Amino acid sequence: MLQACKMEGFPLVPPPSEDLVPYDTDLYQRQTHEYYPYLSSDGESHSDHYWDFHPHHVHSEFESFAENNFTELQSVQPPQLQQLYRHMELEQMHVLDTPMVPPHPSLGHQVSYLPRMCLQYPSLSPAQPSSDEEEGERQSPPLEVSDGEADGLEPGPGLLPGETGSKKKIRLYQFLLDLLRSGDMKDSIWWVDKDKGTFQFSSKHKEALAHRWGIQKGNRKKMTYQKMARALRNYGKTGEVKKVKKKLTYQFSGEVLGRGGLAERRHPPH
């Protein structure tokens, strides 16, 4: 027998020693059968050299079941693993959906801001032309002066009649100067010293003169003497009219008197 093996080219295998522990081949084949689905094709090819295995052999405990009831273990996933995978996928999706905010917004990515539209609603009350005296009353509180007089805001000197320009707008000091020189409303205003330009208002008819001044300006609201006196006291800042210590008395500046006299010579009263 040994000679025949040598002639055929097979290596000689010495007989097993008596010290070796024999093993149960049935137990080894049974364990191999249980892990057979996890063996690769390479492992199956090498296993043919060591033992004979029949893939259709079914364990004795499962002989009563049909063969088609068995599925390979690789296609079965435990429900615990599926839940774990789904939980991991949801966490990854949450991380991807969450925008990354830099630690310093000023140094990170720029965020574009959209302008907010603001609708302008029309005013409920009709627009009213503001007068010089009313504007001064809104911007400065009234001062406690005699006979209801108060400081206010009044624009600078305007154009005098006869001067070149588009539409002429008469000022309060010019309106009073024209009344004094024409003698109109002498019961409401009169000269104290014409040469010095000092004049005085009547304590009884001063409101009538103020009302006429409101009509001259075209104000919708009623003009009062308090508003008119506020504008006159404001002329003291620009120098056209100044307040005299005497009650209800004011004085024109020499420049206003000179310009008024020049205008009177150009356009004498009718």
From Swiss-Prot:
Superkingdom to which the source organism belongs: Eukaryota
Annotated compartments: Nucleus
A GO CC term attached to the entry: transcription regulator complex
Comp. bias intervals (Low complexity): 153-164
Stated induction or repression of this protein's expression: Highly expressed in both FV-P and FV-A-induced erythro-leukemia cell lines that have undergone rearrangements of the SPI1 gene due to the insertion of SFFV. Negatively regulated by microRNA-155 (miR-155).
GO BP terms: anatomical structure regression; apoptotic process involved in blood vessel morphogenesis; cell differentiation; cellular response to ethanol; defense response to tumor cell; endothelial to hematopoietic transition; erythrocyte differentiation; follicular B cell differentiation
Modification Phosphoserine, positions: 140, 146
Presence of keyword Phosphoprotein: yes
DNA-binding region (UniProt annotation): 170-253
PROSITE patterns the record matches: ETS_DOMAIN_1, ETS_DOMAIN_2, ETS_DOMAIN_3
Inhibition and activation profile: Transcriptional activity at macrophage-specific genes is inhibited by interaction with GFI1, which results in the inhibition of SPI1-induced macrophage differentiation of myeloid progenitor cells, but not that of the granulocyte lineage.
Annotated region described as Disordered, given as residue ranges: 123-164
The entry's keywords: Activator, Developmental protein, Disease variant, DNA-binding, Nucleus, Phosphoprotein, Proto-oncogene, RNA-binding, Transcription, Transcription regulation
Disorder: Agammaglobulinemia 10, autosomal dominant: A form of agammaglobulinemia, a primary immunodeficiency characterized by profoundly low or absent serum antibodies and low or absent circulating B-cells due to an early block of B-cell development. Affected individuals develop severe infections in the first years of life.
Assembly and interaction partners: Binds DNA as a monomer. Can form homomers. Directly interacts with CEBPD/NF-IL6-beta; this interaction does not affect DNA-binding properties of each partner. Interacts with NONO/p54(nrb). Interacts with RUNX1/AML1. Interacts with GFI1; the interaction represses SPI1 transcriptional activity, hence blocks SPI1-induced macrophage differentiation of myeloid progenitor cells. Interacts with CEBPE. Interacts with IRF4/Pip and IRF8. Interacts with JUN. Interacts with RB1. Interacts with TBP.
Entry function: Pioneer transcription factor, which controls hematopoietic cell fate by decompacting stem cell heterochromatin and allowing other transcription factors to enter otherwise inaccessible genomic sites. Once in open chromatin, can directly control gene expression by binding genetic regulatory elements and can also more broadly influence transcription by recruiting transcription factors, such as interferon regulatory factors (IRFs), to otherwise inaccessible genomic regions. Transcriptionally activates genes important for myeloid and lymphoid lineages, such as CSF1R.
Protein name: Transcription factor PU.1
Species of provenance: Homo sapiens
Protein encoded by which gene: SPI1
